[in-house]
Amino acid sequence: MNVLVIGSGGREHALAWKLRQSPRVKQLFIAPGNAGTAQLGRNVDIKLSELDQLLNFARREAIDLTVVGPDDVLAAGIVDLFEAAGQDRKSVV
């Protein structure tokens, strides 16, 4: 499973740390991530406000699960954007 964690704080580091422990996770991406998350997966240089670029990245990397940490990204409508693009609601949490 390819997983994308969106955010750059401690919450996202904890999520990435736990996801990294799963044998089901093949690739772990964190956008934009931080120095700590770089040790767990691949940080992706996409700003949290660039929702279209996050969606394009998810498509390009065949992301199976997107975990959104920051509340403001959720409030900006990332789940609606991903759903409108054909991503299953269950795959964006």
Where do the PLM segments sit?
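ATP-binding N-terminal substructure of ATP-dependent carboxylate-amine bond-forming enzymes
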Residues: M1-V93
